[in-house]
Amino acid sequence: MNSDIPDPSDWIDSKLSGLKDVDETLRCHICKEFFTAPMITGCGHTFCSLCIQRYLTNTSQRCPTCMQEQQISQLRKNVTVETLVEHFSAQRATILRVVKEAAKQPIPEVVEPPSSPDLDDGRRRSGRKRTRTNYTETLVSSDDIQVECPVCQAMLPGAAINRHLDNNCNDTGANGGNWLGTKKKTKPLRKIQRVNQASESVANVRRKLQDEGLSTSGSKQTLFRRYDEWVTLWNANVDNKTPRSKSDIKDDLRRWETTVVANENAQPVKMTIKNIDDRQWVQKHKEDYDYLIEQARKSILKKKQEKEKEQQQQQEGHQKAVDRREDNEPDMKRSETEGYQVVS
């Protein structure tokens, strides 16, 4: 097991080998890392926000898993998966360490000491007493829990939430300042709309780049690609539970331009799916492939039947025309013969 480079294979030789599947499920199908700002597609598959936006923008407008057509506008935040990843990744190293240490320790033999009725009664009474004590401590400590105000999003002790709401969120703590630990949430970041290269002018894109504090140099293609990548990076950052600063996103854009846009004629960056075993892929998606193959066969058979039916109808129509012509020929011959009769 290697906790320095987290990988699902870390669990294979442990007593918790079943966590390998959990570990794999909480990873993005594109980058193979734990989900960052996970987004769910219209077809129900989840990817990192940045990964899926780059993939749909630069590679294909189809889901990398099931190949159904997808649009960026269909993406939605997957809050449940984000929470699962947060908790699992936070405890992953600890669980691995505990499992590894437990595997090295011999299992001690449990020897039951002789018991007496008085001793058992004492244990039961002591257990009940400890239970009551712990319950009391839990009740007392629950008032100290920090909760979020549903109106102003301030954090304050649970016992003070009602008074805080009664005062229209204008009350203060004992020291005259805000409640201990109170911190109002900053204004939520907003996503940026993408531009259509076919209808958007270069001057307008250059103005948008300038408004964002970005470079406005380069050709038309460079400007559009720069702004498109900025929108991808920024919107993915907005999806993140803990967004980074704008300067950090600008640094990401500069690194992208340095490594990807080597010149004006550089091809769009391609998102590739790495480290995939062909046999595992086929086995994992066998049902999907079987379904697609069956649908393709039905489609081919249907087209073939329609073509045969059309040909048969054409042949029948041609045969009817021939039959009608043959039926009319004797009458025509008879009329011609009668027309040449000599009247005496």
Swiss-Prot record:
Q: In which pathway does it act?
A: Protein modification; protein ubiquitination
Q: Any keyword DNA repair?
A: yes
Recorded source organism is Yarrowia lipolytica (strain CLIB 122 / E 150) (Yeast)
Q: Which reaction does it catalyse?
A: S-ubiquitinyl-[E2 ubiquitin-conjugating enzyme]-L-cysteine + [acceptor protein]-L-lysine = [E2 ubiquitin-conjugating enzyme]-L-cysteine + N(6)-ubiquitinyl-[acceptor protein]-L-lysine
A Pfam family per the record: zf-C3HC4_2
Q: Where is the SAP domain?
A: 197-231
Q: Which InterPro entries match?
A: Rad18 (IPR039577), Rad18_UBZ4 (IPR006642), SAP_dom (IPR003034), Znf-WRNIP1_ubi (IPR040539), Znf_RING (IPR001841), Znf_RING/FYVE/PHD (IPR013083), Znf_RING_CS (IPR017907)
Subcellular location, in the record's words?
Nucleus
Q: Which gene encodes it?
A: RAD18
Molecular function as annotated in GO: single-stranded DNA binding; ubiquitin protein ligase activity; zinc ion binding
Which keywords, in A-to-Z order, does the entry hold?
DNA damage, DNA repair, DNA-binding, Metal-binding, Nucleus, Transferase, Ubl conjugation pathway, Zinc, Zinc-finger
Q: Where are the zinc fingers (UBZ4-type)?
A: 146-174
Q: Where is the composition biased (Basic and acidic residues)?
A: 303-337
Task: Classify the main location.
Answer: nucleus
GO cellular component labels: nucleus; Rad6-Rad18 complex
Q: What is the designated name of this protein?
A: Postreplication repair E3 ubiquitin-protein ligase RAD18
Please list the GO biological process terms of this entry: postreplication repair; protein monoubiquitination
- Name the residues that bind Zn(2+): 149, 152, 164, 169
